[in-house]
Amino acid sequence: HAMNDMTDKSFDASAKTVLPAPDTTVDVRETFGIDIDWQVPAFSKPDERTPDLDEAYVFDPDTTLAILAGFAHDRRVMVQGYHGTGKSTHIEQVAARLNWPCVRINLDAHISRIDLVGRDAIVLRDGLQVTEFREGLLPWALQHPVALVFDEYDAGRPDVMFVIQRVLEQQGKLTLLDQNRVIRPDANFRLFATANTVGLGDTSGLYHGTQQINQGQMDRWNIVVGLNYLPAETEEAIVSAKNPDIDPKILADMIKVADLSRQGFINGDISTVMSPRTVITWAQNYAIFKDVGFSFRLSFLNKCDEEERMLVAEYYQRVFGEDLPESVVGKSA
């Protein structure tokens, strides 16, 4: 799902955002349903880089306030949580309501310093080949009223982290040595990150390829907020908003299975986890196939490692009281 703006190498460095700066405010109580008197700067119209608005999105109050502080007071905000808690979506949905342009870069996607900063490219000028510097996404974002979101921050390569560390300084200037240029950030440039671990390395070994975020890196983030899995009733509201015809009892049971998978994931028993998105898919498939067990296998079970399927089938059996072909009983039958 990790959307990546980095993959398009032919990035247009001359592109502008629709509006040069926020020109209005948004009332936090009215827009986000959080009981606080606060007007946050916003743009009156969206840009092509403003994320699409999900009307049914449910905001976690603490995380929302942290992200809003990032936008309103130029704080560097990091959102942490397990896989499937919707960290980047949360930042994007806040941005969507502020019409703030947003650029997401997944650091796990083997991004190099050159991708981020830019490269020399050979171009044709009046029929002659000349070398010119092509700006990467980072210099462009810095010079515009854009929220830059680094996803999978804990998986970034050292050369990339070194560049980001410079930008994290409070003045956040970026020096392009090859270019003899210093880029000062736009007054409305914002920086966010999402990370899968608490930066302390991961004791359960769940996230392969994540580095320990060093203390110097962590200290530069002004706000670090933890996003946990949703309370069951919130998740029910989200899934039924997308599947209004579902039987509430079946939905509640689906979420119980999802919770067992999350417990198992946190304990290190399984390596795949059911996110709210998985539950939505399961409910949609159930509407098509009219069979809870079969649609569970299609939506989640078949995505799990073969060794783990028996345990996952057991989660299902515990809640629905039905043995799936993958369960121990099913195997021996």
Could you describe each region identified by the protein language model?
Residues 4-47, 64, 229-236, 241-333:
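Alpha-helical lid/collar subdomain of P-loop NTPases
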